Every structure is written in structure tokens, then in C-alpha cells.
């Protein structure tokens, strides 16, 4: 017996008049890609989504078709026209699916919510086993005020605890949503969203709730673009969960990984964990004659590896130096060394990596620090260099998009490494990340199709990564 499909429906029919951009807001650029591309990517990569339908307004059809083709979004099997209202777009999707079984699960999402967490899709799909309609919502945090718009006076202030803010996706059994729209299209009923239409047309139906995330914002006003860009700059731990896939790591077997700074610390652990998945690894560091601050040194090392393997699939730069001193107390030589290792070295690695990764459509991974968001006293050069690494990553991600090369940056919380111990001494147990956790997280980023992101690794991640590592090291 064939299982019923899970179909993602992305509503991309808006024109974005409130945004004031002069073009539909789903084409706003954030972190190197349009909002629509980010959203399609989430559904494309979700293992439970079988196919995707995009609902477009007519003038954007060719542009969406081009985006889908260039990105290779294989799950998108239809781009259909929507209508003036949101309900017209949903109705168009229902009509396109009229030959599908009634129990087909539909996950309907706004194209302009590009920060959707993968687990929300999973929870919606699971909840449809109990309900025929599901909404995603978060508790209201501000006081809700019921206003008379004619007099501009407060009518009442309801109890906030009973009110939630709706988001998307909204999920439905196809048969239920079709039945609701059959009644709705007869007229006389107003609905602001698909769940409200189900509630008004089918009062016997219970609508389940999945708890959303505050970061799942909708791009509506110009300030939302700024907020979304900042959220993409610092992806929270749930984003790491989104891209973590043990299967993809096993798919990296026999791929070639080069780690600059691989002789100790996080770099050494990346090599150790990578070997567990059958990845061919090469460590470059001063101990084997490679100076990250010397581009000729890196060029020679990469050429040697390529001569042996005939390819390089992934490159990681973990090389770093941290002087815990005021700027005034640092010697000129220490300043130059810090810049060369922490920033110039990253540039050298990126420049040298390009032709090799272009050949394999590979991945590059750099490392930043929480200090990139705000300069820290006693390590001004280090923190400013790490801010530069973030900006470099985001810029290069856009330059490399046409060549299908991925570049990301991992931002680990305080990690138990020799460099940190040397700078700060012995710190309390349980306050520092295990470098193996950071190593595993780094490999999952390499295995993903993400690009242009700064991905946090936090202590909470050890809760689930430690179980994976325990099985790996049995």
C-alpha cells in the first residue's frame, strides 16, 4: 500500500506593497539568497516532504521557474498561478491536487517566512495523525487590546494567556481543506487564513496547535529585512539541528577533507571524527611546514594533496591565535602575527581553495567567535579579526553561488581547547563545550547544502550530539 504524500505548498503570490521595495518581497535578498530560495530550500531538504508546489503571481512565474532550475530544487514539481487574495492561492493549490487522495497531508507556508525550523514541519506532519487541521502559533507577549476603530477607543483588554500569535505553516488533510473551501466559495464567510476558514465552515473540526519559534518572522515591513538578516548572521542552535544528518556524513566516505590547523584543538578533533565516517583527511599546520599567513605555503600544500588525490572536496580553516592582552601591551610583532593568522590566513585559504572547490562543488568552513558581535577588551585584534571573518564568509558566499561552492562559518561557544586554556587558565567543568561536539557540528555543516551562514554551536547541542558521538566511538 502506497503511503500518502506530504506536500509542501509555498505561497509566493504576494506583491509586497507594504514593504515598499518596488518588487515582491519574496525576492528580497537575505544572506546571499532571496527569501523564496531560503524557504524552498527548507522544504527541499526535509526528509518527510515528498513534493513541493509553489503558488506564484503571474508576473513572477518565470523568475521563480529560473530560481528553481538554477538551484536544482528537485522536489518542486509544479509552479501554479495564485490569485488576488491568500484564499485564492490556497484554492488554486487544492484544485491542482484534486486527483490526490483525501488523506494527503498539505503543509502550507508563506514564502516570506524564510527562517522556519525543520522540526516545525515534522511536528505539523505528525500532528495530522490526530487532527485534520493544524496551526503553528506562539504565545502573545504583549498586551492584546480590542479597539473601536471608529472612535479610537479601547473596548476591552482580554486575558493575554488565552491568546496566541498565528504563524505558518498551517497543515491540513487535503479532504478537510477541500471540504472547507467548497463551503467557503459559496460566499457569506470571511476568513483571514486557512485555519480560520476551516473553523468557520467546519465547526465540528478541532484545530491542533504546534508551538512555533519567535524567529519564524514574516517579512512585512522594511525593518523585518534587517531583523531577518541579523537572525541569519547568528543562526541559533535549532538551525544546527535542522541540518544535522548522520546519513549525510556517511555519504562523505572517500571524500577529501583538508583541515588547516589540524594538529591540535578543534581541528584535530574534526580529523578524528571525520575518519570515523571514512573521510580522507589531511592536516596542515606549522608542525608540517604550512604557515597560514603565507599564501605560497598553502598553495604548495593544496597542490601536493591534489596531486595525490586528484580532488579536494572540503576545506576547513581552524587556525587561530589569541593574545589575552590590552592592545597597548602587545608588541608590533604580536599584532602582525594575530592579524596574519586570524584574518589574512582566512583570506589566503579562501583564495587558494577556490579552483579546487569549484571543480568538486565543495565546501569551505571557517571559524569565528562570539566576540565577533562586539569587540572584547584584552583581545581587540582577535575579536575584530573574527568580525572580519564573518563578513568575508557572507560576501564570498554570494561570489561563489554561481559555482555552487558552499562557505559557512561556525561560531562555537567557549570550547575546551589548548588555545583557550593558555589564554584563560583552568575553567569550571561543565562550562565549556567538548571540542568533539564542535567537530561533529562542523562536519554536519560541511555535509549540508547551507551557504553564507554563521552557525552557533552551544552547550545545549551536547544534549543530542553526545549520544551520536557515544555510538560513533563504541
From Swiss-Prot:
This is Bifunctional ribulose 5-phosphate reductase/CDP-ribitol pyrophosphorylase Acs1. It comes from Haemophilus influenzae. In the N-terminal section; belongs to the IspD/TarI cytidylyltransferase family. In the C-terminal section; belongs to the short-chain dehydrogenases/reductases (SDR) family. Its EC number is 2.7.7.40, 1.1.1.405. GO terms for biological process: capsule polysaccharide biosynthetic process; isopentenyl diphosphate biosynthetic process, methylerythritol 4-phosphate pathway. Keywords: Capsule biogenesis/degradation, NADP, Nucleotidyltransferase, Oxidoreductase, Transferase. It catalyses: D-ribitol 5-phosphate + CTP + H(+) = CDP-L-ribitol + diphosphate; D-ribitol 5-phosphate + NADP(+) = D-ribulose 5-phosphate + NADPH + H(+). Residues 1-238 are annotated as: Ribitol-5-phosphate cytidylyltransferase. Catalyzes the NADPH-dependent reduction of D-ribulose 5-phosphate to D-ribitol 5-phosphate and the further reaction of D-ribitol 5-phosphate with CTP to form CDP-ribitol. GO terms for molecular function: 2-C-methyl-D-erythritol 4-phosphate cytidylyltransferase activity; D-ribitol-5-phosphate cytidylyltransferase activity; ribitol-5-phosphate 2-dehydrogenase [(NAD(P)+] activity. The lineage of its organism: Bacteria, Pseudomonadati, Pseudomonadota, Gammaproteobacteria, Pasteurellales.
Amino acid at each position: 500500500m502506497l503511503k500518502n504524500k506530504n506536500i509542501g505548498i509555498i505561497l509566493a503570490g504576494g506583491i509586497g506593497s507594504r514593504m515598499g521595495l518596488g518588487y515582491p518581497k519574496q525576492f528580497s535578498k537575505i544572506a546571499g539568497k532571496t527569501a523564496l530560495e531560503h524557504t524552498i530550500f527548507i522544504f527541499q531538504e526535509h526528509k518527510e516532504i515528498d513534493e513541493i508546489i509553489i503558488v506564484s503571481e503571474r508576473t513572477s512565474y518565470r523568475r521563480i521557474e529560473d530560481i528553481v532550475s538554477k538551484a536544482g530544487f528537485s522536489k518542486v514539481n509544479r509552479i501554479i498561478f495564485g490569485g488576488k487574495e491568500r484564499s485564492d492561492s490556497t484554492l488554486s493549490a487544492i484544485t491542482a491536487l484534486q486527483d490526490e487522495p483525501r488523506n494527503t497531508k498539505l503543509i502550507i507556508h508563506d514564502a516570506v517566512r524564510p527562517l522556519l525550523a525543520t522540526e516545525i514541519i515534522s511536528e505539523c506532519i505528525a500532528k495530522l495523525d490526530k487532527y485534520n487541521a493544524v496551526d503553528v502559533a506562539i504565545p502573545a507577549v504583549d498586551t492584546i487590546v480590542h479597539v473601536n476603530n471608529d472612535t479610537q477607543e479601547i473596548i476591552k483588554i482580554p486575558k493575554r494567556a488565552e491568546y496566541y500569535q498565528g504563524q505558518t505553516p498551517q497543515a491540513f488533510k487535503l479532504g478537510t481543506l477541500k471540504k472547507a473551501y467548497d463551503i467557503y466559495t459559496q460566499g457569506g464567510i470571511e476568513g483571514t487564513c486557512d485555519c480560520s476558514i476551516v473553523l468557520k465552515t467546519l465547526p465540528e473540526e478541532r484545530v491542533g496547535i504546534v508551538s512555533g519559534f519567535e524567529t519564524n518572522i514574516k517579512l512585512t515591513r522594511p525593518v523585518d529585512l534587517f531583523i531577518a538578516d541579523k537572525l541569519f548572521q547568528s543562526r541559533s542552535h535549532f538551525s544546527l539541528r535542522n541540518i544535522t544528518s548522520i546519513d549525510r556524513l556517511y555519504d562523505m566516505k572517500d571524500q577529501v577533507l583538508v583541515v588547516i590547523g589540524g594538529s591540535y584543538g578543534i581541528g584535530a578533533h574534526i580529523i578524528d571524527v571525520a575518519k570515523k565516517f571514512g573521510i580522507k583527511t589531511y592536516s596542515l599546520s606549522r608542525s608540517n611546514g604550512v604557515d597560514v599567513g603565507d599564501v605560497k605555503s598553502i598553495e604548495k600544500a593544496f597542490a601536493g594533496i591534489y596531486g595525490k588525490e586528484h580532488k579536494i572536496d572540503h576545506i576547513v580553516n581552524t587556525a587561530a591565535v589569541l593574545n589575552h592582552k590590552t592592545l597597548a601591551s602587545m608588541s608590533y610583532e604580536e599584532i602582525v602575527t594575530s592579524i596574519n593568522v586570524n584574518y589574512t590566513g582566512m583570506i589566503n585559504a579562501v583564495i587558494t581553495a577556490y579552483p579546487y572547490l569549484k571543480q568538486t562543488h565543495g565546501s569551505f568552513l571557517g571559524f569565528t567567535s562570539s566576540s565577533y558581535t562586539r569587540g572584547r577588551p584584552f583581545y581587540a585584534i582577535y575579536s575584530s579579526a573574527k568580525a572580519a571573518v564573518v563578513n568575508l564568509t557572507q560576501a564570498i558566499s554570494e561570489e561563489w553561488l554561481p559555482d555552487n561552492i558552499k562557505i559557512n562559518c561556525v561560531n562555537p561557544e567557549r570550547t575546551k581547547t589548548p588555545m583557550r586554556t593558555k589564554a584563560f587558565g583552568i575553567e569550571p567543568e561543565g562550562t565549556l563545550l567538548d571540542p568533539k561536539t564542535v567537530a561533529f557540528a562542523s562536519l554536519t555543516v560541511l555535509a549540508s547544502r547551507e551557504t553564507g551562514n554563521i552557525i552557533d554551536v552551544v552547550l545545549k547541542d551536547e544534549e543530542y550530539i553526545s549520544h551520536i558521538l557515544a555510538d560513533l566511538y563504541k
